[in-house]
Regions:
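N-terminal glycine/serine-rich phosphate-binding loop of ATP-dependent small-molecule kinases
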Residues: 1-94, 122, 222-232, 419-421
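Pocket-flanking alpha-helical
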Residues: 84, 106-110, 243-245
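Short glycine-rich phosphate-binding loop at a beta-alpha junction
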Residues: 70-78, 153-154, 206, 391-403
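Carbohydrate-associated surface elements
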Residues: 101
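Active-site core segments that coordinate phosphate-bearing ligands/cofactors
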Residues: 2, 7, 19, 112-124, ...
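Glycine-rich beta-strand-to-loop/alpha-helix junction loops that act as flexible
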Residues: 77-81, 210-211, 259-262, 398-406
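Short, well-ordered amphipathic alpha-helical segments that serve as non-catalytic structural scaffolds
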Residues: 52-65, 186-192, 380-387
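Short beta-strand-loop/turn "lid" adjacent to the catalytic site in phosphate-handling enzymes
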Residues: 62, 66-98, 127-133, 158, ...
């Protein structure tokens, strides 16, 4: 009997539910519903509408139930670091802050006045970023946030949604790891860091790893959806963790680039890599599936283009890519990770002002802006990959690009040109596939990640890009390093 696995995949700009089924040695994915996920600005702060997300999940479940399809289990993955405060009565205390809220500007330095940067990094191995949950929690504590002061439990986004479905509170390993609250060696919540932000382990749900059962749908949810007591399985709750599980690699000599709103570039390791070099380069050691560590760097990704598109009206990606392809190469370059691009009111204006401030030609038309973004991302990928090579325990012979960005032919070719090794693109639905994979492993329908990767490699169309014009890109890389602000 075939088993259907219901995957909830929520990103920072959109979400969807997907029904995954294994058929004849392959995997079939069917999108059930797709919906936007927007920042909500109120009173100078940015929030996520978790009730809307919950409602969209219920809509997806109702659609499957209406068709008479059975569901073996449900798994939820989301973006990282954001969380919900839950009161002693079990109610959510307010909508969760979004990680792009400006209240965490300067937050790391405030915490480091009490516990050193080196100690925080040494315990967690996590890249220092303003919006990490550790710094969000410390900011709320310092600001006497009423929700945090009244909170009995802190639930990260995937865990909050599974709680709303099941009534069970858990803390899933991969999402807690990226929060900068997990000790990289013990793979458990780190008491000293929790104490530093006024919390303890009792403020979090039962600690679980990918593949463990959270609970079953509450009677209320069963009544609303028309479904039975379906189990909810903890997948890799951090979407990157689920995506990397689905990299279609046949050996371990690869790096991955999970390409979406964020670009996350890294390698898999068997143990954390925490030393002076990784700290200086600000690399992160995030928890993965089957005991692996994802040694990676967060890079600003398609956020740059997504925000530009807000002011460009109804434009398609193929249209923008075509315009960029027709423009002069290397006219303008930016550092995609410059703070000025974190959440500007006008992204195109931020890019042009950056180019002007660094003495470059200013993009004058839309295609030039897009080309600037793509070339800058490709060159930034090269910069990060060079650092990654020095840290990786294995040689890097191929870059696997997964996620929505894997459909961008122009950026993929630029990336191959810049890094000088083959780029293998696909699957674009890596996060949903990884989510389904982990559920299937929990159900006994799949054995291990290595076997699942081989199945994906056989059954999902992939495209390989060979490096071209490498001498031109080598020269551009020198220019990139000289002209961009660090």
């Amino acid at each position: 009997m075939k088993q259907n696995f219901f995957a909830v995949d929520l990103g920072a700009t959109s979400g969807r539910t997907i029904l995954g089924t294994f058929i004849e040695g392959g995997l079939n994915l069917e999108e059930i519903n797709r919906f936007p996920n927007h920042l909500v600005e109120v009173g100078g702060h940015f929030y996520w509408d978790i009730y809307a997300l919950y409602s969209h999940i219920l809509d997806g479940l109702k659609l499957v139930a209406h068709r008479g399809e059975s569901i073996a289990s449900i798994g939820i993955d989301t973006w990282g670091v954001d969380f919900v405060c839950v009161g002693k009565d079990g109610n959510l205390l307010r909508q969760p802050y979004a990680y792009r809220d400006p209240h965490t500007v300067g937050a790391p330095e405030a915490l480091f006045s009490r516990i050193s940067r080196s100690k925080v990094y040494g315990k967690t191995g996590i890249q220092i970023m303003n919006f990490n949950s550790l710094f969000q929690l410390d900011t709320l504590r310092r600001n006497h946030d009423s929700a945090l002061e009244a909170a009995d439990k802190i639930l990260f986004m995937p865990d909050a949604l599974s709680y709303m479905l099941t009534g069970e509170m858990v803390t899933e390993y991969t999402i807690a790891s990226t929060a900068q609250l997990v000790n990289a060696q013990t793979r458990r919540l780190e008491p000293e860091l929790l104490k530093a932000v006024g919390l303890s382990e009792k403020n979090f749900g039962r600690f679980v790893f990918p593949g463990e059962k959270v609970g079953v749908l509450t009677e209320e949810v069963q009544k609303i959806t028309g479904l039975g007591a379906i189990p909810v399985i903890a997948v890799a709750g951090h979407d990157t963790g689920s995506a990397v599980a689905a990299v279609p690699a046949l050996d371990r000599n690869f790096a991955y680039l999970s390409s979406g709103t964020w670009s996350l570039m890294g390698v898999e390791t068997d143990a954390p890599v925490i030393n002076a070099e990784t700290e200086a380069l600000n690399f992160t050691n995030e928890g993965g599936v089957e005991g692996t560590i994802r040694l990676l760097k967060n890079i600003c990704g398609m956020w740059l283009l997504e925000r530009c598109r807000l002011n460009w009206g109804d434009t398609s990606y193929p249209e923008l890519i075509s315009e960029a392809d027709a423009c002069e190469p290397f006219r303008s370059l930016i550092n995609p990770d410059d703070d000025c691009f974190a959440n500007p009111a006008d992204m195109e204006k931020a890019i042009t002002e950056y180019c002007r401030a660094t003495g470059q030609s200013v993009p004058e038309k839309r295609g030039q802006v897009v080309r600037c973004i793509f070339e800058s991302l490709a060159l930034r990928y090269r910069q990060v990959l060079e650092n990654l090579r020095s840290l990786s325990p294995r040689p890097i012979e191929t870059l696997h690009v997964i996620g929505g960005g894997s459909r961008n032919d122009l950026l993929n070719q630029f990336t191959a040109n810049a890094i000088g090794i083959p780029v293998v693109a696909g699957p674009s639905e890596a996060t949903a596939i990884g989510n389904v994979m982990i559920q299937a492993m929990a159900a006994g329908e799949a054995t291990d990640v290595a076997g699942m990767r081989q199945l994906i490699n056989r059954s999902i169309p992939l495209k390989t890009y060979q490096p071209q014009d490498t001498e031109v890109w080598d020269a551009a890389y020198i220019h990139f390093k000289n002209c961009v602000r660090k």
